[in-house]
UniProtKB/Swiss-Prot annotation:
The chain crosses the membrane at residues 9-29, 32-52, 61-81, 102-122, 143-163. This is NAD(P)H-quinone oxidoreductase chain 6. The gene is ndhG. Keywords: Membrane, NAD, NADP, Plastoquinone, Quinone, Translocase, Transmembrane, Transmembrane helix. Gene3D superfamilies: NADH-ubiquinone/plastoquinone oxidoreductase chain 6, subunit NuoJ (1.20.120.1200). It comes from Leptolyngbya boryana. One of its GO terms (cellular component) is transmembrane transporter complex. It catalyses: a plastoquinone + NADH + (n+1) H(+)(in) = a plastoquinol + NAD(+) + n H(+)(out); a plastoquinone + NADPH + (n+1) H(+)(in) = a plastoquinol + NADP(+) + n H(+)(out).
Length: 199
């Protein structure tokens, strides 16, 4: 993208803050559905960073594959499992949290040191023409039939997943004869030699 340097810096800061905030929400939120949606926000932020690097095809692939396939697959898995039990508290969970925070801080320190000590060279190459337009033209001219077949296949998979997710659990059917028959009345025992009064 041919943007001014100030616009690129501001866009990078916004996308980086959005990505880091969404990633923290994925880890800290207890609701799995919210975590899945925030994971989609992380993927979209990464796609925006690819756009700033003039990698438009990689950005489109990021959105199509990770947001459109992986994230949707995670959401369908959550809906199909439909587990409503709360997580059991873990004894001394603060030790695990402290260890995780220490590892994350160490990785962040290593990456920061690498970024600050590396002599980055500013590229003066002229950006080439966008390749995603050429790929789109090929999709709708030379490869139109495979493209449409793939879209129909994905549509069938989506409809099947929706049907499975919206299915209703019916109770077990009772025996069909129980509603039409009466239980048999127990017969009274009659001593031997005594006539039945009904006779």
């Amino acid at each position: 993208m041919n943007l001014a340097e100030g616009v690129q810096i501001v866009s990078f800061a916004i996308l980086a803050a959005m990505m880091i905030g969404s990633a923290i929400g994925v880890v800290l939120l207890e609701n799995v559905v919210y975590s899945a949606f925030l994971l989609g926000g992380v993927f979209i932020s990464i796609a925006g960073l690819y756009l700033l690097l003039n990698a438009d095809f990689v950005a489109a692939a990021q959105v199509l594959i990770y947001v459109g396939a992986v994230n949707v697959l995670i959401l369908f898995a959550i809906m199909l499992v439909n587990k409503r039990e709360a997580f059991q508290p873990i004894a001394k969970s603060w030790i695990r949290r402290a260890a995780t925070a220490l590892v994350c801080a160490g990785i962040f320190a290593l990456l920061s040191a690498m970024v600050l000590t590396t002599p980055w060279a500013i590229s003066t190459a002229v950006p080439i023409e966008s390749s995603i337009i050429t790929i789109g033209l090929h999709f709708f001219t030379d490869f139109l039939l495979p493209f449409e077949l793939a879209s129909i296949l994905l549509l069938m998979a989506l409809v099947g997943a929706i049907v499975l997710a919206r299915r209703e659990f019916l109770p077990d059917e009772d025996e069909a004869d129980t509603a039409l028959t009466l239980p048999e009345r127990p017969r009274e025992l009659v001593p031997a030699g005594q006539n039945n009064p009904e006779n």
